[in-house]
């Protein structure tokens, strides 16, 4: 199996780094695309259009977070079966995961499209950007089936330790997205509709690339005969692994929506500042997220092989990698935050100075707390990979409570400065839960293994 990577053998640090690097590069590429997309929208359509795209970002985090989290959860039993070398069982999980994901895709797409405008009203979307925000969000909801398809199939590939191919697919999809942005927005002049259509088509393209690759190179994943049968127990385990992970993102998303709703009430300038800062923040924080994703596969395979000591060694290695990266971000963000934010606005705009100053402040405050975020992602994904998604979901509840508290009490007093502390307070709250939770899970697994 030349297209797979057994993470139960070899040096843990090397395995984690080799798996995480393509993920990190892929997501950085995605975030660069999102930054380019926001820059195109902000500079060529206007600050109002940038705010319209950003006004729905927290909603998309909730919806897409549920989709992506669920798909990541569905891949955990597959990674564990692969680690245990039980390939027939692995393929049966693949067949049942496809069924569950199809149902989720249809239900979510129908419901979100029907309630699109009502959702925007709930988050206090300013009236002057409501129409553009509605058009963009509706197109994003139509993208849900393709997003689920890509994340599910890419999750299957990563469960086998192969993170390179999904990275290549992200490169292709991101390049297509940028080309479509230029064509639809700058050439044809479609406005925010062009940005939405470009995203939809590029997601479809990435899903098709996964299908072709699996059929050609990873036939070990393709179910045959009785492996295709519906199995209640497997569906139950998939739901038990996937739904809590999906809900974790959605619960976290509720807190982010509360925070964005409080920020939206401050006015269009602050919506634009929040949008610009979040775009760049995700560019830097996706590294932490993908170290965590690597840990989920690493822990999943090693639990399947019952090599529990490798899990502790892997977590320690991941923390050291995270701290080294944090030092790098400090050297970039602290001195250059203002310059990065200037890419999103037309300097001739009367509001450009306020947008840049507030967005840069958001970036610097968040940067101080990146080690807290890094520990959060490492422990959360490790717990998920070890098969305890319910506990990781509870950390999302802690984040939600923290962000809601900031939205209700801190933002009214300190305005945008309060918004800047929404994420750090949430990260600290989650870590206070995850540290003892990880210790509990590891000790429980050791006890059962003995």
Show which residues each predicted segment covers.
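Transmembrane helical elements of multi-pass membrane transporters/channels
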Residues: 18-37, 139, 173, 202-206, ...
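Helix-terminus/linker motif at the lipid-water interface of multi-pass membrane proteins
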Residues: 32-50, 120-127, 183-190, 250-283, ...
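Interfacial/gating helices of multi-pass transporter permease domains
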Residues: 41-61, 127-132, 192-193, 234-241, ...
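Short alpha-helical transmembrane segments in multi-pass integral membrane proteins
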Residues: 1-20, 78-143, 187-243, 299-368, ...
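N-terminal transmembrane alpha-helices
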Residues: 7-44, 58-73, 77, 102-109, ...
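Hydrophobic transmembrane alpha-helices of multi-pass small-molecule transporters
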Residues: 62-65, 109, 177-182, 207-211, ...
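Short runs within selected transmembrane alpha-helices of multi-pass transporters and secretion channels
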Residues: 71, 139-158, 166-174, 195-208, ...
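Small-residue-rich hydrophobic transmembrane alpha-helices
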Residues: 50-110, 147-166, 273-337, 373-395
